[in-house]
Curated annotation (Swiss-Prot):
It is found in: Plastid, Chloroplast. Homodimer. InterPro entries: AB_hydrolase_3, AB_hydrolase_fold, Carboxylest/Gibb_receptor. The active site is at 232 (acyl-ester intermediate), 324 (charge relay system), 356 (charge relay system). Expressed in roots, stems, leaves, petals, stamens and pistils, but not in bulb scales. Inhibited by NaF, AgNO(3), HgCl(2), CuSO(4) and phenylmethylsulfonyl fluoride (PMSF). This is Tuliposide A-converting enzyme 2, chloroplastic.
């Protein structure tokens, strides 16, 4: 049975929790006190996970799912329909078990962070990071809209890797960060993730002209300096949003280890057919209606894809890692952008001897420090 036909045959059942991540949904919070940022690794304690950590049921219903945990395993839970470890396993019963990207670190005043629901209908929320501005309360800060990675199927704004990394980045770069907590596949197939991220971006931009929805953005956001960034699937989303934004809104984009694929193996993909097969399955799980690996959503340089000259920003930097399975895809994207006739400034930054999103788990290594220094310089326009 194909993945798509399996999904369509499932009976309507509730998800694990409101946002489809096997945990409680985000809630709106009031403005909190701003204090000096603590070291990210000491910021907050992870929320404890339950026994069926990240497990949910698929449903065909478009309504917001009601809270429930996966029930006691049955015989159907022994039959695996799709094994995509280390990300997730889907069982015949419809239960989904995630192994990565489900731990959540709560927002807390000590690091000047908070969560805000931007769409109650979908539960989509953002996590804001405000650096210490006590001495300069009227200072306006560049606004960085960030999209997390995870292959469109795992991770969230509250995961330790992203919370700690973005806390550190906000403190060092002096930028106000808005991290988008988008819905995940397979419960919410693409284009749900794209739609949520586009909605999050538009929500940020709306503060430049409309009523003050979010005090931190209204008081401290410099909307002449809106930047986008994301890693892996978030790098893919960064490209997606920048292609569809209004002209003149985005100052720059930083695309980190982008999750781009293609039907024809390139570079180190040629000698790794197992990895190609894995990512083909993962992409088709996230996008069951896809045209395949040359779908412009996953291969922006495929024949027929929108020309990259349409990227709506002034500056772009593409980061790639030498040991990353996706390294050649990032290079190809950069080269296609430069050759497209796009009028902005582009730069390719490659780090050797490191793999995919290495910087999220190692903040103090020489290469990680060099990468953050480069990213900060880009965000500041230096």
């Amino acid at each position: 049975m194909s993945v798509a036909s399996f999904f369509s045959s499932l009976p309507a059942r509730p998800f694990g929790y409101k946002d489809g991540r096997g945990r409680t949904g985000m809630v709106s919070t009031t403005d909190i006190g701003r204090r000096m940022v603590k070291p990210p690794v000491l910021a907050c304690r992870p929320i404890e996970s339950n026994t069926y950590h990240g497990s949910v049921f698929l449903t065909k219903s478009s309504r917001s799912p009601s809270p429930s945990l996966s029930p006691t395993p049955t015989a159907l839970d022994d039959e695996i329909v799709l094994d995509l470890k280390p990300f997730l396993i889907i069982y015949k019963s419809g239960r989904i078990e995630r192994f990565l990207g489900t731990t959540v670190i709560p927002a807390c005043p000590e690091v000047a962070t908070k969560d805000v629901v931007i769409d109650p209908a979908t539960g989509v929320s953002v996590r804001l990071y405000l650096p210490n501005v006590v001495d300069l309360p009227s200072k306006k800060l560049p606004v960085l809209v960030y999209f997390h990675g995870g292959g469109f199927v795992i991770e969230n704004t509250g995961s330790p890797n992203y919370h700690n990394y973005l806390t550190l980045l906000a403190a060092k770069a002096g930028v106000l960060i808005v991290s988008i907590n988008y819905r995940l596949a397979p419960e919410y197939p693409l284009p749900a993730s794209y739609d949520d991220c586009m909605a999050g971006f538009n929500w940020v931009v709306s503060h430049s002209a409309g009523p003050a929805l979010e005090p931190w953005l209204a008081q401290h956001g410099d909307f002449s300096q809106i930047l986008l960034s994301g890693d892996s699937a978030g790098g893919n989303v960064t490209h997606y949003v920048a292609m569809r934004a209004d002209a003149g809104v985005i100052e720059g984009v930083a695309i980190v280890h982008p999750y781009f694929l293609g039907s024809e193996p390139v570079g180190n993909e040629i000698n790794d057919p197992a990895n190609i097969e894995f990512h083909d399955k993962l992409w088709r799980l996230a996008a069951p209606d896809t045209e395949g690996l040359d779908d412009p959503l996953i291969n922006p340089v495929a024949p027929g894809a929108p020309i990259l000259a349409g990227l709506k920003c002034k500056r772009a930097v593409v980061f790639v890692a030498g040991n990353d399975f996706l390294v050649e895809r990032g290079r190809m994207y950069y080269e296609a952008l430069v050759k497209s006739g796009w009028g902005g400034e582009a730069e390719l930054v490659q780090h050797e001897g490191v793999g995919h999103v290495f910087h999220l788990s190692d903040y103090s290594g020489d290469i990680s420090v060099a990468m953050m220094t480069k990213l900060i310089a880009f965000l500041k326009g230096e």
